[in-house]
């Protein structure tokens, strides 16, 4: 599958790879570079681009396309209590609250790491790795009560992540929401 904005990404020099069933940018060619892999056991052709992107994100802000990440929803009167049983962190049942957490296996080992977002009371979106979509879906269903539906909405939504020390400055220019820690 390609992303909805594939052609736009390509026009900006994206070099694509596959992850989680999606063709997605792995890196962006710098001016004058070819947006293609030159495979080698030595210095990789994409190292300068990756270094530039990393440094820019560390010092400023970077926009990352996370559309292939797995996305699930549960909505039920018992949704919050069910998530409290299967997640290691305290899940907030308040709209807009977002919690990074883990799910464990019976031996106490980490099965997956994920983010749980409360959309409205007892209605949650769960976001996890693109590469572990089916495994995570199986694991979550295994521990949810059978009367709670887990919907896979991965292919229905685009997701972007804004990272870096200047990310809040940028998001304030496009949203009236409060993104401060509180």
Specify the residue positions occupied by each region the protein language model found.
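Glycine/proline-enriched, intrinsically flexible loops and inter-domain linkers
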Residues: 1-182
């Amino acid at each position: 599958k390609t992303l909805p904005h594939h052609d736009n990404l390509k026009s900006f020099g994206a070099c694509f790879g596959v992850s989680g069933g999606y063709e997605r940018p792995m890196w962006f060619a710098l001016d004058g570079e070819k947006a293609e892999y030159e495979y080698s056991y030595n210095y990789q052709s994409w190292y300068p681009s990756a270094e530039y992107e990393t440094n820019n994100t560390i010092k400023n802000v970077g926009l990352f396309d996370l559309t292939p990440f797995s996305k699930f929803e549960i909505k039920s009167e018992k949704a919050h209590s069910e998530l409290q049983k299967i997640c290691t962190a305290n899940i907030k049942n308040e709209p807009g609250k977002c919690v990074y957490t883990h799910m464990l296996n019976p031996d106490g080992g980490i099965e997956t790491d994920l983010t749980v977002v409360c959309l409205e009371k007892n209605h949650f979106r769960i976001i996890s790795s693109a590469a572990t979509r089916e495994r995570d879906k199986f694991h979550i269903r295994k521990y949810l009560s059978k009367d709670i539906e887990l919907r896979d909405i991965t292919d229905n939504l685009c997701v972007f992540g804004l990272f870096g020390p200047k990310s809040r400055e940028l998001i304030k220019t496009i949203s009236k929401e409060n993104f401060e820690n509180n």
